[in-house]
Amino acid sequence: MVGKRNPTVPRGMTRKGAPPSGWSAYYRVVARIPRGRIATYGQVAMLAGKPRAARQVGYALSALRGTRHRIPWQRVLGARSRAFAAISILDPMGSAVQRALLEAEGVVVDDRGRVSLERFGWAPRR
């Protein structure tokens, strides 16, 4: 079984069911995003000190599914341009949940799932 994944351990999780310790930096950044604001995966990675790890941020947030946590995952979107970020969850149910959570916080999501970074983007104080 060398090289094979253990099917009883969810992808991205350790055998003990905890996320990899390197992901805690991403979770700390996401926890700082205020209600009604959004950040991009790349922005979270950069603020966590890992500027080329946007995809890892996505894996880390995806690993939260089905767990009890207080991380506001819905506030992290995929960058589409300098002006917009967008919901990037491919699952229609997941993207609908993310949209509803964002709209409940006052974030305007257009028909294409985009959010204005100028209006709703988070600019943290360093």
Language model regions located:
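Nucleic acid-binding interface residues in structured DNA/RNA-binding domains
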Residues: 2-126
